[in-house]
Each structure stands twice: as C-alpha cells, then as structure tokens.
Swiss-Prot record:
Subcellular localization: Virion
Keywords noted in UniProt: Capsid protein, Virion
Pfam families: MCP_V20_C, Sputnik_MCP_1st
Gene Ontology cellular-component annotations: viral capsid
The name this protein goes by in its record: Putative capsid protein V20
Protein's job: May self assemble to form an icosahedral capsid. Most abundant protein in the virion.
C-alpha cells in the first residue's frame, strides 16, 4: 500500500541491463511454398483508359495486396511562339518535373472487380489531399520512391525556385535525409532545345484502392480469388501529369511550353501470388477491412484575390451511415485548372489556409466553431497528418537584407483538416462510426488565399471515409458499409481495461488475422484485449463498449478472428494509408518473447 492520499498499486520494473532471464524463444517464420510475381500486360489501352485482366493462377493462391502499375510514356514539348528568341532550353532543372503521383493525377476513376464485386476510387480528386496523411518520410524515401511523390509545398512554383525543398528540384538539390524532389525521377531525355523537347521512360505507381495496400508493409493477402480486373479511366487533360514553374512565363502570363503531346505504350500491372504450405488451409470465407470513399464538392462563383479571406458554406450532404473520418479542404477550382495548358502544368496541388471551421451535424449547429486553426492542426496530426504547422497554415516569410526593401511573404501548401467522428466530433449516445441511419452534414469554412500571385475560385471538398468489411468466398465477394445499429451502441458497456492507444495499435488491418495473431499470442496489451473480448462475450455484438469508434467491430468479424463459431489464423501488419494501426514490430516481438 502506498502513502498516497489515494492508495496506489506499487509494482517493480526491471532495468534493461538487469534482464538476465536465460529463457529465449526461436521464432520460425512460415511463408509460402512458392512465391511468384507476374506482369499482366493490358488487354487494351489508349489515351483514355487502361484495361487489365489479372486472374490468379489458382483459387488456392494468395494475392499480395501490394500491387503496382507500369506505364511507358513518350512526351513531346513544343515552345510557345510568344517566347520566340529565347536562348535557354525548353525544360529547365528545378522548373520542370512530373507531378506527384502522376498516373493517379490523370486517373478520373480506378475501377476493379474482385470475384465480380466492383470497387472504385476517384483518384485525381483526392490523391493529393490524402497523400499528406500516413506517409512519413521513411515511406516516401522507401517504397514510394518508385514514383514521383514529393508533394507541392509552395502555392506557386516560382517561390520554390532555387530552394532546397523545391519539389521540382534535381537529385543534387536534395538536402541531407530529406525527401527526393521529383526532378530526380529517372527519365530518358531524347532532346531538349530552345524550341522542342522530348522525354521517354517508364512510370511506376502503387494501386491506391481499398482493399489493396500502398504503405510498403505486408498484410494478409487476398485469398479465394477466381477473377480480378482493373480499369483505369483517364482524364482528358493528360498534361496534368507534368509540373512546370511559371517563373519563366512572359509578362502576359504565357508559359514557355506551348503544347504537349503525351502518348503511352502498353502498360502492365505487377501482381505477386503466394502458394501456402499444405498445412496452412485457406478458409472458405475471409473478411478483410474495406473502406469506401465518398466525395462531395461544392463550387463557388466568388473569387479570392491574394491574401483575401472569406467564409464559404457547403451544400447539405445526406449520409446513410456515420463515416469514420472526414477530410475537409478548399482548393482552386478544376474549372480554372483545366481552362488551358498553362494552368494545367503551372498550378500546384495546394490548398487554402483554413482559419475557422463550423459544422452542422444532424441539425446540431456550431460544432467546432470555437476551435482555433491550431486546434484543427492538432486534430489532423493526431489523425495522421505529416506536414508542419507552417505548411498547414499556408504562409511563411523571408527577410530582405537590402535596406528599404520589404519582407517577402511566401505562400505554402495550406491545410487539409481530418476529423474523426466520435473523437474530434461529438456523437450522441446512440451514435458511433458505422451506425446506419439518415444523417445530414454541412460544413462552413473561413479560408484565406495565401497565393501571392493568383486569384483563386474556390471549390470545397468533403471526403467521407466509411469503414466496413469485404468478405471474399470461393466464387464471390461482398462489401458491407455501416454495420452497427443504434441499439447495439446504446447497450454496449464501457470497459476500463483497454486504453484508446492500445486499441489504436492493433486496429486497422486484416481483421481475420490481426486480432487472432496479435491478441491471442503475445504481450500484456494483447492479453487484456483478448480477455476482455472473452469475458464480455462480445462476439455476438459490437465492440462499442470501448469508448472509441475503432472499437465498433461487428460480431461476424469477431467470429472470423477466433471468437464465436469459426476459427481462422493468419498474419498481418497494416491496413494502408487511410487506416493506420499496426502489429508488433520485430523488435517488440523479440522483447515480448523474452518476458
């Protein structure tokens, strides 16, 4: 008993150098008996779309969920006649490069069918907002370095000219351990003169589509596959694949690049298949994490001059389920970007500064109206945002060392707010992420145009992420979004045996393997969650007893991870950029095995 005013439990912890336990465990990693990677050339392709049939060699193989596309290209640039007489080559170092995620940037919709079930995502509309989340530098300089991925960080490329963090910079301009600029991406420069330029090469890019993965980590693969197809529907404005600094524009704003001709050769998709060992049976039905993204855009006629602020209100959005997350941002209208070639290649993928946010949720008004922009940044960082406060705030300055000259104001990339419902946005007693019903949402934002050169016509985006499950059986697949009822949420009891952070570490992946593998075998955290699941007999209801939306897991999923009628094993790590959550690292596993 402690001498505290409120008695405390006193425990002892061994100092690491005195952990002298001789008992050790040798870990054997059991992989497949055969691992094979196949290129699947497109069955048809054009400047409008790519089509693939990627049927697995056998339903008894497991598809690696890390999938990427390879696209050979040939691009010709022609100088703008208004720049006749220029003496510099058309493509300039630090002023020309591929856009971040170039294939996704020109993909209106990526469609896939899994055993006949359709899944899709509007890549071009959301990739540059969501890529600011759950993509730390380690990921960018690792797996994601196969594609240009350095996001635009200035409101105008002209402000990035000569900077170490210029997204269009070359390899030699990268400082220290920073992210490689997009100008370092390998290409073959066939010609580059004052009047014309031509580049050829190959672009690689991950498949950013649930239930596939794109963070470089492994997870439970897709099994029971009999058919798999992909359809990439491209934008009519293919020039959006390229970024060009407007610092070389003439006084009328005309770019040095007057035209671009973009052609693709036959693309391929690369998929890996693992044949399990004979003593590792594949269950007839497997449940995977799945999320659906819905985009709601409100366009405005008002314009914002440089440094001007205004308040904008979205249309009322009707939802039939409570989403897990909301991504909110305002950016230059696509109608403006696609007006001409100059706008397409010189407009960075950036956002307006968010000063204030006011939500109306299910007729409750004034939600988060008192939150400062610093609060909104904090919410976003907690939810996986990778950028600094200055970048989120969208503005910085540069002192002028010359007497009498003003300090230069520089516009930075601006903010994307991410809110988690149930944590950042309060919900009623009978509401939680995944609850089915009729809900209305309206967003009001006060924003500032921090671009020091360009007037902005704003579009407001609301991207809702709905969490659910994808069940794949021998011949079919089916997704479920909105899996909890109000009655289950009301009847769920609160437990103090599992903390929010503990649950976050294990949530967000392959349900059929993550809970079973992590919770059932190692660690005190695992034991607490494991015992709670058993003691509360929650396999037939929802994990709403844990005060966080991550805990709203349907009973059927729990049965698939070993609680209830079925019992399935496996191994898994992460669920992808939008989810987060992880299994034990190897270092943590070694530590736990020594305990």
């Amino acid at each position: 008993m402690s001498n505290s005013a409120i008695p405390l439990n006193v425990v002892a912890v061994q100092e690491p150098r005195l952990e002298l336990n001789n008992e050790r465990t040798w870990v054997v990693v059991k992989g497949g008996q055969q691992v094979t990677y196949y290129p699947f050339p497109s069955t048809s392709f054009s400047s409008n779309q790519f089509n693939f049939i990627c049927n697995p060699p056998s339903a008894q193989t497991v598809l690696d969920r890390l999938v990427f596309i390879q696209v050979p290209y040939d691009i010709t640039f022609t100088a703008n006649p208004s720049h006749a007489g220029i003496t510099e080559n058309l493509l300039q170092p630090g002023r020309d490069a591929f856009r971040a995620f170039p294939i996704s940037s020109i993909t209106n919709t990526l469609n896939a069918t899994i055993n006949g079930f359709p899944v899709n995502i509007e890549l071009a509309q959301i990739i540059h907002a969501l890529s600011r989340y759950h993509t730390p530098l380690k990921v960018k300089n690792g797996w994601m370095s196969m594609q240009p991925s350095f996001e635009d960080n200035y409101q105008s490329y002209r402000d990035a000219d000569g900077a170490n963090n210029n997204p269009l910079g070359v390899f030699t301009s990268a400082a220290g351990l920073s992210e490689l600029p997009r100008g370092s991406y390998t290409m073959n420069v066939v010609t580059n003169t004052t009047t014309t330029a031509r580049i050829t090469g190959v672009l690689y890019e991950q498949v950013f589509l649930p239930p596939f993965l794109w963070d470089g980590e492994q997870a439970g693969g897709l099994a029971n596959l009999t058919s798999l197809t992909f359809n990439w529907v491209l934008n009519n404005n293919l020039a959006r694949i390229w970024s060009h600094s407007d610092i070389t524009n003439d006084v009328s704003g005309n770019s040095t690049i007057g035209s671009m001709n973009i052609s693709f050769q036959q693309p391929s998709m690369y998929l890996g298949f693992v044949t399990p060992r004979l003593n590792i049976p594949i269950p007839p039905r497997i449940t995977y994490p799945y999320f659906k993204l819905s985009r709601y855009t409100t366009q405005f006629q008002n314009t914002l001059a440089p440094n001007a602020s205004s308040t904008f209100k979205s249309n009322v959005v009707q939802l039939d389920s409570i989403p897990r997350k909301l991504y909110l941002f305002v950016k230059q209208s696509d109608n403006v970007i696609y007006q001409n070639l100059n706008n397409q290649i010189t407009t960075p993928d950036v956002f307006l500064q968010i000063n204030n946010l006011n939500l109306t949720w299910n007729n409750q008004q004034g939600i988060l109206s008192g939150a400062s922009s610093q609060n909104l940044y904090d919410f976003s960082v907690q939810n996986g945002y990778n950028k600094t406060w200055s970048e989120f705030n969208g503005v910085t300055q540069q002192f002028n060392g010359v007497s009498g000259q003003p300090t230069k104001v520089i516009g930075l990339e601006g903010g994307i707010v991410c809110l988690e419902l149930g944590k950042d946005v309060g919900l009623r007693d009978d509401e939680a992420e995944g609850v089915i019903g009729n809900f209305n949402l309206q967003v009001q934002m006060t924003v500032t145009n921090t671009n020091q050169y360009v007037t902005v016509t704003p579009d407001m985006y609301i991207v809702a992420v709905y969490d659910g499950t994808l069940v794949i059986s021998n011949t079919s697949a089916m997704a479920s979004i909105g899996v909890a009822s109000k009655e289950e949420v009301l009847n769920a009891r609160i437990t103090h045996g599992v903390s929010y952070n503990e649950l976050q570490r294990i949530y967000g992946g392959d349900f059929f393997s993550s809970f079973k593998n992590f919770l059932g075998k190692v660690g005190n955290v695992a034991g607490k969650v494991n015992n709670f699941l058993k003691d509360s007999k929650i396999a037939s209801s929802v994990l709403g007893a844990i005060p966080h939306p991550y805990a709203q897991v349907p009973g059927q999923i729990l049965k698939n991870v070993g609680y209830g009628e079925s019992h399935v094993g496996g191994g898994k790590k992460k669920g992808g950029v939008l989810i987060g959550g992880r299994q034990l690292t190897k270092a943590e596993l070694r530590k736990e095995l020594k305990m």
